[in-house]
Every structure is written in C-alpha cells, then in structure tokens.
Amino acid sequence: MTASAKAVQESQASRHQQEEAYPRAPYAWYVVGVLTFVYVFSFIDRQILNLLVRPIQRDLGISDTLMGLLSGLAFAVFYTFFGIPLGRLADSKSRRGIIAVGFAFWSLFTAGCGLAKNFIQLLLMRMGVGIGEAALSPAAYSLITDYFPPKRRATAISIYSMGIYIGSGLALIIGGLVARFATAQEAWNLPIVGETRPWQVVFFIVGMPGVLLALLMYTVREPIRRGVRSVKATDGKPAVEQTPMREVIAYLKANWMTFLCHNVGFALLSFSSYGASAWIPTMFVRRYGWTEAAIGQAYGLIVAIASTLGVVAGGRLADWMTERGSRDATLRVGLMASVMWFPFGMAYPLMSEASWAIALLIPAAFLASAPFGVAPAAIQQMMPNPMRGQASAIYLFVVNLIGLGLGPLVVAMTTDFVFKDKQMVHYSLLIVGTLAHLVSTALLWVGIKPFLKSLDRLKEWTVNQA
C-alpha cells in the first residue's frame, strides 16, 4: 500500500469514527455506574485512615503532623506522579484494563496497611495505594467522554464524581462504627499475620474485596475513540497512534493561562476540602467531646448525601447552562460554588454548639463538592481526544498534590506549630479554608476569558487534523 493510499484509509477511518453514533444511553449509564462503583471503593480505601487516627496514634506513637503526612502527602505524591504516565497510557491503550489492574493493586496495598507495625511500613503501604489509584480517573474520564455527547458529559462526569462523596461518606460511617471496636479491643493473634490490632483488621476488611471486584471492569466495552488523528486496522481491531509528547507539551503551552487558573483554582478548593474532611472528625472529638462513632455517622451522612447532591447539582447546572449557550459553564459553576461557600464554611468552625456546627456543615459540604464534577468536565471540553488522558492526569497531579497532599498536612501543621494546642484545630480549619477559597475564587474568575480562547483553539486544531 502506498503512503498516500494509507493516509486516505486512515483519514476515512477517522471520519467514520466522528460520524458514528454514541453508544446507547442505557449501556453508557451502566458504564458510568461501574466506574462510580470503583471510585466509591477507591475513596473508602483512601479515607478510612481518617477514622482510625486515635488507635493508630496510640499504637504507633504518631503525631498529628505525621498523621497528616500519611493521610495526605504520602498518598498524594505517588498518586500524582504515577498519574501522568498512566494517563498517557490511557490515551492509547485499553482503559478498562488499566482500571482493572489499578483497582486490584490499590486494594492489595490497602489490606497491606493492616500488616504495618510501624510508621515507615504504614507509609510505604499508603504510597502503594496512591500508585494503584492513579490508574483510575484519567482512564475513567476518557471513557466517559467517548460514551457521551458534549451536552451530557458534565452530568455523566459529575455522577462518576459522586464516588468521591459516597466513598468518603461510607468510609466515615463504617469507620465510625468500627472505631469504637478498634479503640477498645486488645490485640489478637491471627494465623500467619501474628499479633494484630483491631484497626489493622479494618484495613483487611475494606481492602481485600477489591481484588476480586476488579474483574467487574471486564463487563465494560472499550468505546470508539473520537477525534483521534490516526486509526490503523490491526487484526480487525482499531488501534490508536499515541500523540508525540512534544505535541502534547506544545498544546499545553499554548493554553498555559487556562491550565494555570483552572488547575490551581480547583486545586485550592480541593486543598480546603481535603483538609476539612481529614480533620473535621477530630475537631468534633476534641472540641465537642463526641466519640469517633458518633461523628463518623453524622459527618458520613452529610458527605454521602449533601456532598453527593452537590456534585450532581453542579454537573446538571453546567449542562443546563451549556444547552442555553454558555460555553464557559463548567468554570462558572465552580466559581459560583466557591463564592457561596464563604458564609457557611467560615461559620461552622466557630460554633460553640455541635448541633450548629453540624447544621452549617450541610450547605458547606454541598457547595464544596459542586465544583468537582465540572472541573474534569472542563478539561475534556477544551482538550483534543488524543491528549485528554494526559491533560486529566496533569489536572489530577496538581489537584491532588496541592489538595490531598498539602490540605490535611497544612491543617495539622497550623495546629501543631502555630497554635501549639490540639484543641485549636477548629481555628486551623477556619484559616486554611478561608484563605484557600479566596485565592481560588480570584483564579477561577481570571481564568474564564483564557478558557474561552482555549475552546476556540480546540476548534482550530480539530479543523487542521481533518
């Protein structure tokens, strides 16, 4: 076959790909359901540590700052750095396979946390959890984008993002129920493992099911990749040519202002949210004298219900605005939610009564979650298909390094080194959350105009590739 004939064949394949209808809605929503289920498990495994602070500190002699390191930076560094090569892999290889292997991997390391006998061992296991979970979201965002047309993507991605809050809420509820058990019981002698504390058993229980449940990903079909530049027939199956890294870097440079405002703006909202979710349970234990079980159930319900409704509402609002001609709806929804958070997010740490703090946490949680379905949807909206996995991985790199990596740690360090009083954790939450939202609001506002220019640039890129 001549080079010109080959080029024509590839061009025809690409056009056919663009014209083919999206998969049927019932199956597309089934795929979102499976991905959300996997995401729920990832957040249960990620967040369960936050409800076991007291027994872990008791048995391993770990300070608040080191607990902040375990719940945040130790996980986030590996999650973020491995996300970029795994996101690049998701742009050309089997996305369902990447997710399935990652699911089994992080589940094994979650269970491995139950084998930890000291801080270093627990640190290493948390790093492994981070590596495994890095496989999930870049591939999931890419799959969802190829299953849904643009006017439905923000809702679909927001429903997937519900997994954050359902998983976190379940982790709090389940963790709260087992925290009393984990705190009170003596060590057990288990076969093979030896002396085991009840909090270690909790890690076994939440980690091991995922090893088998990873097989569920093989009920998901790989959809046709839309907007790819080159599709070659290999044994009757489509294959995707990976976009050279230099082209990806060049495209990102051309849109640098959009990425700066978007990624850092949403990362600071994540910084506030992760800091709050890590230390709100401890705040209620120290400030109001609640048990871990009581706050786990109360805050877990808030996260599972209010935060889940918030992220879906954000996506639905963005799609509603998009259908009515708002091209920047995904960014504007994040901006609006950030502004509306202030009266509630600044008030709940100052309440002298626990009941008032709980009441204010409901709208604060709703508004804090609303941006996190539209944020990844904005990335899919502005990036060419062959670069979406990598752009999503970079977004997750920034959001999780700043948010998950530093949020819990900065709250803990503010308590340990600024106030030097464990009872002042509520003031740490107030200061960290308020400053993060102020800077985020400014960045998202500034980023709207560059975002619109990026959408125009994508149209030009698509025309040039036709």
Predicted regions and their residues:
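Structural signature of the two symmetry-related core transmembrane helices
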Residues: 97-111, 328-345
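Conserved MFS/SLC helix-loop-helix module at the cytosolic interface between two early adjacent transmembrane helices
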Residues: 81-119
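Extracytoplasmic gate region of multi-pass secondary transporters
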Residues: 49-50, 255-311, 369-372, 376, ...
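Extracellular/periplasmic helix-loop-helix junction of adjacent transmembrane segments
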Residues: 52-81
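Helix-loop-helix hairpin linking two adjacent transmembrane segments in secondary transporters
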Residues: 160, 164-222
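Central cavity-lining transmembrane alpha-helices of secondary-active solute carriers
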Residues: 72-86, 301-314
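Juxtamembrane intracellular "pre-TM" segments in multi-pass secondary transporters
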Residues: 16-24, 223-261, 287
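Helix-breaking motifs and short loop linkers at transmembrane-helix boundaries and internal kinks
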Residues: 61, 94, 115-121, 149, ...
